[in-house]
Amino acid sequence: MQYENVVQGRFLSRPNRFIAVVDIGGTETVCHVKNTGRCRELLVPGAEVWLAPGVTPGRKTPYDLIAVDKGGKLINMDAQAPNRVFGEFARRFDPLAQEVRPEYRFGASRLDFCLTRPDGLHLVEVKGVTLESGGHARFPDAPTERGVKHLHELIHAVEQGHRATAFFVVQMAEVTDFAPNDDTHPAFGAALRQAAAAGVNVVAYACRVAPDRMEIDRPVPVIL
């Protein structure tokens, strides 16, 4: 996926989870943060950030904050990007997929993707990962009851004879492995292990990231 007309800035502050104040060429500019997670380890005063012009007519903020430099490591923090890059990658991930259907209603939830195969359905829930420490990627960075619910829906899918995958898009390149963040949300880690034991495929992929683009690159080991 590609962004157009990306500009560079320096993060100053985050008044709330939706906006940030960024220095762009010496001018303080209020920007939209495309990630409502905490991101405390990323958005620190003085951090180098990248922004894409907003395209929605009538919006109040001229830019979306999409990427940040963390100690020399470029991290995409656009919460919409993981689904976009998986949509581009889906047929490489599952070569038997004949149709890629986003936002698929299943049970009491709307899962991110349904891949239609000759032998049935392959349901995929995508999660973006921006939390990293010492090369180890972790999810989530804040408690997510919605994420736990999605894992239970994937278990139900397997019980009904479907294929199911929890797909973690690590929004950076330089990571060695992925694991659930039990310190932040033990229930999510427990649900992920339960899903894996039930037959849900749990995978994580690192990405190639530049200020103006991101694409899925390679699988990384999942530690449960």
Spans of model-derived segments:
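Conserved catalytic cores of phosphodiester-cleaving nucleases, focusing on short active-site segments
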Residues: G9, F86, L111-D141, L154
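Beta-strand/loop nucleic-acid-binding surfaces
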Residues: T27-E41
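Acidic-basic catalytic patches of nuclease active cores, encompassing PD-(D/E)XK
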Residues: R40, G71-P102
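Nucleic-acid nuclease catalytic cores
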Residues: G135-E145, H152-T184, A206
